[in-house]
Amino acid sequence: MAAYPESCLDATVLNFVADLSLASPRHPLLCEFPPGVPFGDRTLGYREGRPGRLSQFDERYQEVEGDEVEYEDPEEEEEEGEGRGRVASLLGRPKRKRVITYAQRQAANIRERKRMFNLNEAFDQLRRKVPTFAYEKRLSRIETLRLAIVYISFMTELLQSKEEKEAS
């Protein structure tokens, strides 16, 4: 206890630690574990009333990874040579891994390069239309968009004020 400063060790903290170490059921933050349930069981959250995933509501479902779950049908007899369960999405359809070929990846890279080229060209055209000082460095995309918004607003107000003067 000498490693902790005295201010951190008030009576509440010491009582809580003592209750934890003695497994006293009188502390409100402690919960009783049913017999036979290992500590950290995923179904424990459901028993405590916490919202959980599908695997917590039915023991036939087991989480595999991400949004995938593995369903084990207790009535279905499987042989050793077959798979030990079907991996399915949450919609119940079989999960099929998408295989991307080298040619598809190359085509996607070309499309992405073309998209970025067109986007950069559009920003360059916008930079030429928006007035800036000649000695300024090249504006970033966000600076270009913000300056364009200000410029368009200014030009709109200028036109509206000119129309009001002509009308009166």
Swiss-Prot record:
Pfam families: HLH. SMART domains: HLH (SM00353). It is found in: Nucleus. Residues 65-88 are annotated as: Disordered. The keyword Glycoprotein does not apply. Residues 65-81 have a biased composition (Acidic residues). One of its GO terms (molecular function) is DNA-binding transcription repressor activity, RNA polymerase II-specific. One of its GO terms (biological process) is floor plate development. GO terms for cellular component: nucleus. Keywords: DNA-binding, Nucleus, Repressor, Transcription, Transcription regulation. Detected in the developing central nervous system, in particular in embryonic ventral neural tube, brain, and spinal cord. Detected in embryonic intestine. Detected in embryonic and adult thalamus, hypothalamus, midbrain, pons and medulla. This is Fer3-like protein.
